[in-house]
């Protein structure tokens, strides 16, 4: 680009309003948490600036009875540990029908311990989180969920490593009312949820204030597309 066409300015939160209200700023876009998005939208609305918000998500990955278990499990793992789980559309809530729930849990227990955590410059599967405070927030959410009745299957501790590392964590038996279900966990935590059937799986997927992304695993492509387009409140 020619000089001064595009400029990246890093500022603390207290200076955001000063920038947004400047007459030279025509529009505002933000990718971040819901609380930050709310505050930016408030300021942008006050000064009548066009606004695009891409905020948090608690993305459901629904695994139906006829799904290919291995493909579904691998997709969930890859979709969750990418960038140490710090992706807005990562696989945050894994909702499996009762018929396949235990098979999926067994596959997670088999595969996840083999994943290597370490320096991302090395041949590893997962690196550190963005900051110690972000890591501590995730750990607090995990601990809170366990205290509420979720079963800790893997991970869930702060490792003795230099840096903001958090291990791949698997929670099972997650239910509405638990932090792992109700909130966005922005880190490498897989929350496994059991649904009695397809209808309950869809209801659980939609039982959230978030609506960023979702995925459905089934061998029936036509049914999957119908559910995705007409019944899942995301996207």
Predicted regions and their residues:
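Short hydrophobic/charged patches on amphipathic alpha-helices used for structural packing
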Residues: 16-20, 73, 199-202
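ALDH superfamily catalytic-core signature
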Residues: 27, 33-175
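PLP-dependent aminotransferase-like
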Residues: 1-16
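Structural motif
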Residues: 9-11, 31, 215-217
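Short helix-initiation/N-cap motifs at beta->coil->alpha
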Residues: 12-15, 57, 196-198
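Short glycine-enriched loop/turn motifs at secondary-structure junctions
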Residues: 22, 55-56, 87-89, 122-123, ...
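Conserved C-terminal structural/oligomerization subdomain of aldehyde/semialdehyde dehydrogenase
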Residues: 25, 62, 158, 165-235
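Short alpha-helical
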Residues: 13-15, 35-36, 46, 222-223
